[in-house]
Amino acid sequence: MADKKVEKILLLNVHSAMNVGDDALLRSALRQLRVNFPESNITLSVNDPASYTGAERGLASIHAWVHPIDAGGRASWKFGRLLWLMPASLIPVLSQRWFKRPFFWLTPGELRPILEEYLAADLVAGTPGGYLYSSGSGLSLWTVMY
């Protein structure tokens, strides 16, 4: 069986370009991906999409939907969205798997672009850092793992 060419990469756990450490980890991950997959298109799943101005396409992450950052730079949990996350994301994923096309009937418009990227990606990778030390009493880790 021939190896499938990696054309589309989705890079997860990109927090904010405003944080120097996060930005350095992102640059390192992008450099490694470009070396290993030079022909690929890379899309970023960003928790603070307004802060990212790089060449790669940046989309609001699932985490950004359940824990958005307001204009003042403060983030707050949207618990209703957190409860809605499971059906809103599982229906498109399972319908893609079973019927070869995603059904977005219950998916809010803000989530659809990132879910479409997940489904279209040949490779999904995560940037290092932030998984264990983020705030949210474990909710951040749960949404990243989901």
Where are these regions (language model features)?
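Aromatic- and Gly/Pro-rich donor/ligand-binding loops
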Residues: 2-146
